[in-house]
Structures are given as C-alpha cells and as structure tokens.
Amino acid sequence: MDLASFIGFFGAFAIILMGGILGGSASGFFHLPSVFITVGGSYLTLFLAYPLSYTLGIFKVCARVFKSADFHEKEIVQRLYALAEKSRRTGLLALEEEIQDFDDEFMRTGLRNVVDGIDGEAIRNLMENELSHMEERHNRWISFINAWATLAPGYGMLGTVMGLIGMLMALEDKSSLGQNMAVALVTTLYGSLMANWLLIPMATKLGLQHEAEVKSKEMIIEGVLAIQAGDHPRILAQRLLVYLNPKDKRELEAELIKD
C-alpha cells in the first residue's frame, strides 16, 4: 500500500469538501448532468483516440497508484553480489537450482540465459529489448491519463457553455439567474477537479513508479552481464552501487566492498 497516495487522495478530498461546507451548502456542488458531461463525455472521447484495451483497462492501471512500488534496489545488489561470488567459486551451472525460485522473472530469465551459455551480447539485447517494450507500454498508459487530464477541463467548460446558453434563454425569469449560473459553473469545477485532484497526480505517480522500475531492471541487466563475464563480485557491486541512494550506498559499501 502506498500511504502517500492514500493521504493525497483522501486528504485533498476532505479539504475540498470542508471548503464547500464552510462556504455554504455542499449539496450545491453536486449536479448529476454535469457529472455525465464532464466524466462521461471526457472518458468516452478517449474511445475515439485509444483502442478498447486501453479505455477498458485504465482503471486497473490507476489502481496501481495506491500500491507500493518499492523495487528493493538494495536487495538486488545483495542478491547479484551473492550469485557472483557463488559462480566464481563453483561455476555458472551451480546457479541453476537457486534461480528457479526467484520471484523476479526478469532476473530469473536473464540468469537462466547465462547458465545456458548464451553470449553476453545476445543476453544484453534480449534484456534491453524487453525493457524497451515495458517502457513503451508504460509511457502509453501515462500518455492516456495525461490525455484524459487535458479533455476533462474542456468538457467542464463545454458543460458550462451549455448551461449558460440555457440560462440566457430564460433571462425573463430573473429569480433563477443565480441558481442557473451556479449550475453552469459546476461542470467547470468538475473538470478542474478531475484534472488537478486525480488525473495529473496519478500520471505523475505512475511516472515515478515507471522510473523506479526501469532503474531496477537496468541494475539487473548490469549485474547479470557482470556474472556472465566472470567479473569479480566487488567490481559488480561498484557498478550497481551508483544506482542507490547515499544511505543505502554507504551501508552496502561497508558490507560488500570494505569488509
């Protein structure tokens, strides 16, 4: 669970709701036709721009914002270091049984190719190709959410214009002008909320998760290729430690290099 995402989501909602209550009547901020125009209209327009696999799968992707995305870079260094030590002592074939239980499919596949004697350049190409396709897939999803964030305020403004047209057509009833104006502006509020409370922050968080996953896979590629080349475990560690934050780097330097 990503605690920061929950704090941001529910905290911002609570502040907005409190502002509405303190400013008057919170019920005045709910208008079902405005929801249909802003949320439904902007979402359905995405069907025109993206295939069904994206428009129907976006909610599952957005749910990842609330899941922890710790890729355990420190543990990656420790594991690859231990494998490098073992391969130098007992040979690459000794790794075969150990890697079968790895949860990380990317690391497991790369190391299996090493054990099978595949050329280092071929292993690099395979792993970098998989990483490239993952990046492309993630960037499409982030682009989808950013596109929705662009459309939502536009549909909010569209609803407002529609409401203003209706208001102008009923100018003779001056007693309802204020209420009609308020209803017209609610759709603009919804569009702004969708973009600034939900969609833009979600795209940003998914982008950060994407960067962290790319970094972890780049570390794995470097480590797997170092094991394939028979590099000394300390050389492997020095290559991978540059990816870590200063605190973890100092701890692992003391553990792996300076002992």
From Swiss-Prot:
Domain of life the protein comes from: Bacteria
InterPro entries: Flag_MotA_CS, MotA-like, MotA_ExbB_proton_chnl
Chief localisation class: membrane
GO BP of this protein: bacterial-type flagellum-dependent swarming motility; chemotaxis; proton transmembrane transport
Cytoplasmic topological segments: 205-259
Membrane topology: Multi-pass membrane protein
Physiological role: MotA and MotB comprise the stator element of the flagellar motor complex. Required for rotation of the flagellar motor. Probable transmembrane proton channel.
Membership in a protein family: Belongs to the MotA family.
Subunit structure: Each stator complex is composed of 4 MotA and 2 MotB subunits. 2 A subunits and 1 B subunit are thought to form a single ion channel, so that each stator complex contains two channels.
UniProt-recorded name of the protein: Motility protein A
Organism from which the protein derives: Treponema phagedenis
Gene from which the chain derives: motA
